[in-house]
Amino acid sequence: MLPAWGTSTEATASHAGWDGDDEGDIRAAYTEDEKKENIPPISLTSVSTNGAYPGQKRRRSESVRTLKPECPPEETQRLRQRRRISATDATQSSRTMNVIEDRKPRVNRARKSQDAPSTSTCGFETPVGTKRKSKAADSQKPPKQSKLRKIDEASTSKAVDNSSKDGKKTTKPAVTQSNRRRSGLSLRPVPIETIFSESSGRESSTEDEADVSHQQRVEKIAKNPIMVVVLPLGPGNYPNNERITVVSTYKSRVNKNCNEARRAQRHGSWSRKGIAFPGIPTKKFTKSDLAKYGAHASNWPAQAAFRSEEGKILIYYEGWTCLTLHRLSVEECARTAPTILEEMSIRDKFIETVKSAAAEEAKLVVEKNQENGIELTLDEALKQIFIEPVPQSSPENVFWIYQDLSYFHTMDNRDLGLAPVFYISSYTQSVRPPCYAYTAINIVDVDAYKRCLESRANMSFADLTGQKIWMPTRSKACENGTKCKCDARFMFLYDPHDVTNLECTPDGKVDFTDFKIDNARIVMECSDACGCSLDCPRRSLQRGQQHPLAVYYEGPEKGFGVRAAANIKAGELVCEYTGDVTLLPTSDPVASSSTKTDDGEEQENPEAPERVDSSYDAAFNAMDTKIIISAKKTGNISRFINHSCDPSSVFVEVYSRRFEEDPLIPRVAVYAIKDIALGEEITIAYYEPGIEWKRSSVKCRCKSTKCMGTLPAF
């Protein structure tokens, strides 16, 4: 049950040098000139996250190679050095991205980019432009192993292609799918259909999953950061806990793995005008930057993919504008950039589902107009409510801001093994996407952090029980059910008459049987004290969001909402509600509810739950009523979940920490209380239906059959 998202290395797309008969000029998609030119395809090559990017001096024949796992690191380095030496004989047939001058390809290997980072192949860092070792160094080499020679010869034979236009042999990267999996260079993610099988709800066993070291995945998740603490101490790691990041002030930045985007932010000639989005680059490379920053690279990181009318795939590169879009075959993308292709399939399937629902709505519009004597075709009615989002030719178009938000926020999710997120608008008018700082983990204020450390819930289980005798309850969900301490911990911390302990089923779903939405509730997750692994069904929040989600513009009345980009079963985790964890300000007026007496008069109800007067604040009723999570400025896509009088999900307080030594910070998760279909909006109830709040003049627009008409007043 460990997450499969984010475990694969990033796929990168490579620009190939043009043949002499081609124009060789990079053009934007959807232009008339491009249809007339014979633009050659670009091949994709999967490399590690620190792979080669535009601006690096790297020959095409030196691109990603595969080595058998039994090769020791020393021999791997020596083999790579021998390949560089032998590659000089194949210089004229090397397919490297060139600057086209006078319509003739030219390969410049003498120039070394100042901004080129080191390349990473097989996990070893190699400076770009590494020269041949001295004879003294060569003399220290052990005799060549025949096994390595066979690998080199096999790679060379596979890398020869006789299909180039000038009749010369062309060197291609000798990377097969099976070798990529063995060497770890391109670890394909499990397709969404096999990860979340509707029949079992659990991860399916696939060939790619079998190749992944389970222990490595467990160790990776165990080392993932659990929070960011804002302390005056300054940046660094919190003493004695490497999973806590400490900063003096929190600022959203471009993901550390997006090297090309960070390089473009420094040197790109194109800049976005208007508002800046936190953590999203404002500058990119464009056509005019090819000669200086893109001419000598063989591998470009692919950011997104789109289907073209010709059945090809349009690749949108990280750090570059849409003016450098290129078409590739589906087979090439599937072979070398499966992650991008998989995300494209998820997005396209979501858009098609939403379009089908819009078509049904358009039919009702046509019928209504016919009753009034107005002739309206189905296509005309559909265009009034749905415009399919497709790539635009101008980098200034708001469409590309949506793509940047989708990509960079997904990259933040990948670092934690979480599923991708998408930002999509099919509204008939251009709508600027939301502006906020994205974070996949909570940002904890120092005062709230100190309060959590002093809380009774933060005590280890041994300290909590003391000398008291406790009887373990045989948990049906925990892997180590006879020694699970979660239910016993709940009994020591909370009163079961006031708080409902939502238990999990053996398949990891929360049991919402006899659930009442207005009851205080909590989910107790396992820690290392229970003796179970991270696969345990009672650790769903620790594994995080495993279903792709989409922030979708619902229209001017509701604004942005969240929709499911895959089927979600009742009881499954949707996502966590993240943001700034702070103390409830004493100066802020706390909403006091009112009820109506038998005479129809209103009176204050002091027993009603306290409400913070903010639509982005999540308060706690069980764990700590003095702490809130505010997603007004910083958070994840859960901040866009809209209200419904008949919700499909619910906020649940979660007691969760991987290790007893980790500080216990109250967390909030979103769980589905009913099956949510692909394309369906995810909603929660902002107001308890069992309490009759003072009515306001604000109309509720949830459009459910249980709608209460108007929203409560505070």
From Swiss-Prot:
Keyword Ligase part of the UniProt annotation: no
Coiled-coil boundaries: none
Stretches the record annotates as Disordered: 1-214, 586-611
Enzyme Commission code(s) on record: 2.1.1.-, 2.1.1.366
Any Pfam family the entry gives: SET
Subcellular localization, as worded in the UniProt entry: Nucleus; Chromosome; Nucleus lamina
Main location per the UniProt record: nucleus
Assigned protein family: Belongs to the class V-like SAM-binding methyltransferase superfamily. Histone-lysine methyltransferase family.
Task of the protein: Histone methyltransferase that specifically trimethylates 'Lys-9' of histone H3 using mono- and dimethylated H3 'Lys-9' as substrate. Acts redundantly with the methyltransferase met-2 to position chromosome arms at the nuclear lamina. Required for small-RNA-induced H3K9 methylation. Together with met-2, protects and stabilizes repeat-rich genomic regions by suppressing transcription-induced replication stress through methylation of H3K9.
Name of the protein this chain belongs to: Histone-lysine N-methyltransferase set-25
